[in-house]
């Protein structure tokens, strides 16, 4: 693998957020030769994505080493020095030396092992696949829930047989039962046969209120007697208007009959 040293160094020192940072002791690896005492070298490590950088100190301006965390495993190991919480980065490729690192305590050791184990793109692909599987299952269960809810609502809203007192089609409006809290729903109908166009277009008190969005059907007026009285007013108005027009047309007819 070929990397541009300037680009890598710029990325290591950039303000991009790091996934994990801290001091670790290291034995071997590029740029970190073992110390004569064998206690390892304490360096500042920065993990960004799948790249692990090491610096001389926290304020270091040039990375000492770089480890690309692909095709490797992170596991606990024994440190050359007692009382060290060590772990190793081992690669699958032959001839590649493992990187032996050690933290100051068990909590730091566990945190580093988790962070390094989850840094590779291979782990990210596994996470994405698992999330996609969970998303498919969630969508499937949601679809089943919606279907069952729709079936339940449809079964509750099945049309019922009309009662004996149902007036049917009256005054161009039919009254049918529905699942609404009102108990009755008004549906517009066509013009009944036998009525004149002028008589049908005449707006009575009930139809005017209906045209304005005011309906006589309410929890207080849902009984048959109240509905009958309400629509009876419109019928009386239509009859009165029809008789008045008939009386007005009679003189004209008599004048036409004279020689």
Curated annotation (Swiss-Prot):
Cell compartment(s), UniProt: Early endosome; Recycling endosome; Golgi apparatus, trans-Golgi network; Cytoplasmic vesicle, Clathrin-coated vesicle
Protein keywords: Coiled coil, Cytoplasmic vesicle, Endosome, Golgi apparatus
SMART domains given in the database record: PH
Stretches assigned to the PH domain: 17-121
UniProt free text on domains: The F&H motif, an approximately 12-13 amino-acid sequence centered around Phe and His residues, is essential for binding to OCRL and INPP5B.
InterPro entries: Boi1/Boi2-like, PH-like_dom_sf, PH_domain
Coiled-coil blocks: 124-149
One GO cellular component, as annotated: recycling endosome
Statement: the UniProt record of this protein carries the keyword Coiled coil: yes
Single biological process term from Gene Ontology: receptor recycling
Pfam families in alphabetical order: PH
Cited Gene3D superfamilies: Pleckstrin-homology domain (PH domain)/Phosphotyrosine-binding domain (PTB)
Function recorded in the entry: Plays a role in endocytic trafficking. Required for receptor recycling from endosomes, both to the trans-Golgi network and the plasma membrane.
Note: Was named after 'sesquipedalian', an unnecessarily long description of a simple thing.
Family the UniProt entry places it in: Belongs to the sesquipedalian family.
The protein's name: Sesquipedalian-2
The keyword S-adenosyl-L-methionine appears for this protein: no
């Amino acid at each position: 693998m070929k990397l541009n040293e300037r680009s890598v160094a710029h990325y290591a020192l950039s303000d991009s957020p790091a996934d994990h940072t801290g001091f670790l002791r290291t034995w071997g690896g590029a740029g970190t030769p073992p110390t004569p005492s064998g206690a390892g070298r304490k360096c500042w490590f920065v993990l960004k994505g799948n790249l692990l950088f090491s610096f001389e100190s926290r304020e270091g301006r040039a990375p000492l080493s770089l480890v690309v965390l692909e095709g490797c495993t992170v596991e606990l190991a024994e440190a050359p020095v007692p009382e060290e919480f060590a772990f190793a980065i081992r690669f699958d490729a032959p001839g590649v030396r493992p990187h032996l690192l050690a933290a100051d305590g068990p909590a730091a050791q566990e945190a580093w092992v988790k962070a390094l184990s989850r840094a590779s793109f291979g782990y990210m692909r596994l996470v994405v696949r698992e999330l996609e599987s969970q998303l498919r299952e969630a969508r499937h269960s949601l679809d089943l829930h919606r279907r069952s809810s729709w079936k339940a609502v449809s079964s509750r809203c099945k049309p019922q047989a009309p009662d004996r007192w149902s007036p049917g089609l009256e005054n161009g409006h039919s009254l049918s039962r529905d699942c609404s809290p009102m108990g009755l729903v008004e549906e517009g109908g066509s013009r009944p046969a036998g009525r004149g166009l002028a008589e049908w277009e005449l707006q009575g008190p009930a139809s005017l209120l209906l045209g304005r969005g005011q309906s006589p059907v309410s929890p207080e007026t849902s009984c048959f007697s109240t509905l009958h009285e309400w629509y009876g007013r419109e019928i009386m108005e239509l009859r009165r208007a029809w008789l008045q027009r008939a009386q007005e047309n009679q003189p004209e007819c008599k004048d036409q009959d004279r020689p």
